[in-house]
Amino acid sequence: MAATILQGKEVAQSIRAELANEVVELKKQGVVPGLTVVIVGDDPASHSYVRGKAKGCEEVGISSEIIRKDADITEEELLVIIQQLNENPNVNGILVQLPLPAHISEHAVIEAIAPEKDVDGFHPISIGNMVLGNDTMLPCTPHGIIELIKRTGTQMAGKHAVVIGRSNIVGKPVSLLLQQENATVTMCHSRTQNLEEYTQKADILVVATGRAHMIGKEHVKPGAVVIDVGVNRIETGKLVGDVKFDEVKDVASFITPVPGGVGPMTITMLLKNTVAAAKKQAKQ
């Protein structure tokens, strides 16, 4: 039986419609959610992501600003900009687009953002709160993955979830969020031996390795929910995931396509975090 294709775009659209209604209500109370994105250098992929974020803001009624800086900006100059945004009451969310040039410490930049404006969910305080299960800004891609799984109607409690990849941006946080949904979680990575032994037992399989087509049908338990986070451009110029979509879709119960699966959810969760930040800051 062929899998149901989990179109992140459709789920994202329904969440954005809910957010747009929330923003209308906030504006009636004089609160206009505001997001500022800082981008350094001229990486085409980064500029494309930033345009997507600005478009998303416009769609739901969030006020957005993009601050573009040349790659030769100093770390000190960038930290001054962040401090000014921290102090600006019209800015509810601050996002510094990664990656940054080598001479700027990502760690220092992320730590400089006020935790209440950390809509990417990367600040150590946000991460600590997530580990403790406290109410906090969740990292956008992992949060989007959990929302996608929920929309399949899959009960995560008691299920075996396998996460391949242990990055700070996806692998580690999504494994934590799956645990908080009471799944039993196994984390695999580049050093894991006999990968199939783990993946074949997964009711939920999240693949975030950045290696094109590394997961085939032989890795997948029949009926599993497969979430493909990878985005890889192959020699033909085509974008593909970490999963061999055409063969795995015949084994899985649900599968995300690339592109159009997890990607649209990431920006939508950023918008959700910005609206949540605006609400919290309005109460303070």
Swiss-Prot record:
Pathway assigned in UniProt: One-carbon metabolism; tetrahydrofolate interconversion
Catalytic activity: (6R)-5,10-methylene-5,6,7,8-tetrahydrofolate + NADP(+) = (6R)-5,10-methenyltetrahydrofolate + NADPH; (6R)-5,10-methenyltetrahydrofolate + H2O = (6R)-10-formyltetrahydrofolate + H(+)
An annotated Gene Ontology molecular function: methylenetetrahydrofolate dehydrogenase (NADP+) activity
Signal peptide: none
Residues the record lists as binding NADP(+): 165-167, 190, 231
UniProt keywords, alphabetically: Amino-acid biosynthesis, Histidine biosynthesis, Hydrolase, Methionine biosynthesis, Multifunctional enzyme, NADP, One-carbon metabolism, Oxidoreductase, Purine biosynthesis
Superkingdom of this protein's organism: Bacteria
Entry GO CC: cytosol
UniProt record, GO biological process: L-histidine biosynthetic process; methionine biosynthetic process; purine nucleotide biosynthetic process; tetrahydrofolate interconversion
PROSITE patterns for the chain: THF_DHG_CYH_1, THF_DHG_CYH_2
The enzyme's E.C. designation: 1.5.1.5, 3.5.4.9
Gene3D superfamilies: Leucine Dehydrogenase, chain A, domain 1 (3.40.50.10860), NAD(P)-binding Rossmann-like Domain (3.40.50.720)
InterPro entries: Aminoacid_DH-like_N_sf (IPR046346), NAD(P)-bd_dom_sf (IPR036291), THF_DH/CycHdrlase (IPR000672), THF_DH/CycHdrlase_cat_dom (IPR020630), THF_DH/CycHdrlase_CS (IPR020867), THF_DH/CycHdrlase_NAD-bd_dom (IPR020631)
Family, per entry: Belongs to the tetrahydrofolate dehydrogenase/cyclohydrolase family.
Assembly, per entry: Homodimer.
Function in brief: Catalyzes the oxidation of 5,10-methylenetetrahydrofolate to 5,10-methenyltetrahydrofolate and then the hydrolysis of 5,10-methenyltetrahydrofolate to 10-formyltetrahydrofolate.
Listed name of the protein: Bifunctional protein FolD
Lineage: Bacteria, Bacillati, Bacillota, Bacilli, Bacillales
Gene: folD
